[in-house]
């Protein structure tokens, strides 16, 4: 059931979106599928109820790390405020594959337009001896300990700012991206978009990484990466179709040269990147050769198949909202359309009979500020 129309590879985004919208036909789910869905939903609800980490885990390792930290916080009576999280920005490099990306490194005479592509191909073949032509990459991960073990140099990015203290003196300094307890207008506003997130830079070599942008201008460049991240955050049954269409509109024929690493850099998700990379191969398989028109036609066909693949009138759909029971029998009742155990209100922990040590009631509303004891 995890295969979207027209695609041979499973797509978790499509699968879970249909489940959450109650559009997944019940006939496609086996008893084992129902039990797995029930266990995942129950764990997700319980994790959300005790979560005080304002970051979304990207893999099983990060989920285990965050879950263990939340259990420690719960045992220590932590409440109200999200804790600070540390994210590693890993700097790397890769070989460019698009001939247009290496035009600046062509070192032979060009007599006409027909000489450009062969000259660019020569540069691509000699990339091993020309590291300056490689493309810089940036990926983020919350598994900071793994990064510290694997990378030869890790830099903590800090900004130092002087501001007036509560006693009126001007000799108080702060480091990092603290934002103050009550707004702190005199505190350095760098990286104030997220008060609970800290960053480290992991660099494989010493050199210039990125330029600091101007602050306070009120102008934000609408880049392709931001458009793609917005599409991914909005969700939907066919996110890869919308992302592929946006990239195709922006890059045109260069889309066919994008590799998996390029897609990962855009969407920051390996599964979605693999699905997007497969779309280029699908264009060639269905139309014989890659072209912008063929890619647009494929996107149009996939969107039409997705719309037609919704649950038809009168067909039983799996009730995801009722899938919160603690036993397989309750899962089966949800599959059959019966009413399973009702979920607790949002943000409130459901009491379980075997949860005695950590049965501490519902946490209060979580705030993104900082407390005195945290400082």
UniProtKB/Swiss-Prot annotation:
According to the UniProt entry, its GO molecular function terms are: single-stranded DNA binding
- The answer to whether the entry has keyword DNA-binding is yes
- What Pfam families does this protein map onto? Viral_DNA_bp
GO terms for cellular component: host cell nucleus
* Gene Ontology process terms (BP): DNA replication
Entry's InterPro entries? DBP_sf, Viral_ssDBP_head, Viral_ssDNA-bd
Provide this UniProt record's keywords sorted from A to Z: DNA replication, DNA-binding, Host nucleus
Q: Which Gene3D superfamilies match?
A: 1.10.150.560, Viral ssDNA binding protein, head domain
Subcellular location(s): the record lists: Host nucleus
Keyword DNA-binding on entry: yes
What family is this protein classified in?
A: Belongs to the herpesviridae DNA-binding protein family.
Function as written in the Swiss-Prot or TrEMBL entry:
Single-stranded DNA-binding protein required for DNA replication.
Name of the protein in question: Major DNA-binding protein
Q: Which organism is it from?
A: Equine herpesvirus 1 (strain HVS25A) (EHV-1)
């Amino acid at each position: 059931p995890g295969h979207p129309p027209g695609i041979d590879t499973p797509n978790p985004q499509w699968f879970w979106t249909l489940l959450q919208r109650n559009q997944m036909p019940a006939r496609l789910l086996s008893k084992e599928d129902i039990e797995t869905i029930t266990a995942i939903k129950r764990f997700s609800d319980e994790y959300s109820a005790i979560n005080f980490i304002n970051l979304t885990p990207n893999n099983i390792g990060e989920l285990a790390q965050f879950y263990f930290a939340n259990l420690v916080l719960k045992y220590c009576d932590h409440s109200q405020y999200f804790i600070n999280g540390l994210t590693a920005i890993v700097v790397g490099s890769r070989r460019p594959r698009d001939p247009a990306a290496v035009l600046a490194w062509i070192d032979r005479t060009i007599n006409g337009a027909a000489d450009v592509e062969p000259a660019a191909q020569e540069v691509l073949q000699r990339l091993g001896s020309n590291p300056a032509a490689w493309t810089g990459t940036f990926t983020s991960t919350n598994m900071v300990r793994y990064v510290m073990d694997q990378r030869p140099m890790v830099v903590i990015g800090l900004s130092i700012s002087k501001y007036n203290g509560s006693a009126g003196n001007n000799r108080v300094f702060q480091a990092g991206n603290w934002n103050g307890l009550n707004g702190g207008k005199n505190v350095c506003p760098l990286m104030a978009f997220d008060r609970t997130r800290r960053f480290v830079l992991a660099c494989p070599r010493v050199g210039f990484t990125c330029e600091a942008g101007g602050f306070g201008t009120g102008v934000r460049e609408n880049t392709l990466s931001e458009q793609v991240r917005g599409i991914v955050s909005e969700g939907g049954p066919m996110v890869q179709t919308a992302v592929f269409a946006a990239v195709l509109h922006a890059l045109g024929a260069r889309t066919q040269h994008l590799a998996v690493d390029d897609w990962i850099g855009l969407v920051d998700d390996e599964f979605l990147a693999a699905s997007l990379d497969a779309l280029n191969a699908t264009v060639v398989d269905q139309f014989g050769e890659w072209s912008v028109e063929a890619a647009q036609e494929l996107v149009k066909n996939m969107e039409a198949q997705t719309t037609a693949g919704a649950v038809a009138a009168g067909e039983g759909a799996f009730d995801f909202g009722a899938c919160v029971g603690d036993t397989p029998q309750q899962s089966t009742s949800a599959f059959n359309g019966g009413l399973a155990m009702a979920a607790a209100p949002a943000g409130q922990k459901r009491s379980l009979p075997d949860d005695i040590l950590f049965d501490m009631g519902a946490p209060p509303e979580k705030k993104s500020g900082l407390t005195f004891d945290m400082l």
